[in-house]
Amino acid sequence: LLVNHPLDCPVCDQAGECWLQDYYMAYGLYDPKFDEQKVKKSAKAVSIGPRVMLDAERCILCSRCVRFCDEVTKTGEFGIFNRGDHSELGVHPGKQLDNAYSGNVVDICPVGALTDKDFRFKCRVWYLGSTKSVCPGCSMGCNIDIHDNRERSQRPHIAKGARVMRLKPRYNPDVNQWWMCDEGRYGYKFVD
């Protein structure tokens, strides 16, 4: 997985939440014995919809986002294009990622290839506290975690002093499973 993945964990927005980073640290540091050529991917970070950015260079082609859009939302915006080591994730031509559950692809991406425009480079996850709650967006009562800026008093410059940084879904098999609609997810500004 690390052959074509950039080792830029210190500047990656997914640092601290990245599954690949966790596996890398748990199962031994990558020490290549040969000089391999990295496959060049497309543009560094591109907007694929009103809420999500795609950094194809970081994508490990796990296809979780493709399956989510095909099986859960049934909108099918994503696809894997080209073949072999030139394969890339992208949205189908003429489409953009704009469905009611588009923010969930950021949660299921294991490596930070898909990032949330609202949260991108605003705050590091190790500065966040988490509180269990219920989504204020509608009457469905989705279970959520409120991620707040717990370092606000010591570091007021982080995210311009905002308290609530984001809302993320919390698993509840009877109500919302693992998912959360964008109305609730991006309503965090009204919670603050």
Annotate each language-model stretch with its function.
Residues D35-K38, I158-G161, K168-D192:
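Cofactor-/ligand-binding subdomain signature composed of acidic, glycine-rich
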Residues I144-D148, P169:
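Short beta-strand elements
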Residues L1-I144, R155, R163:
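Fe-S ferredoxin-like electron-transfer domains
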Residues F81, H147-E151, V191:
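Short beta-strand micro-motifs enriched in acidic
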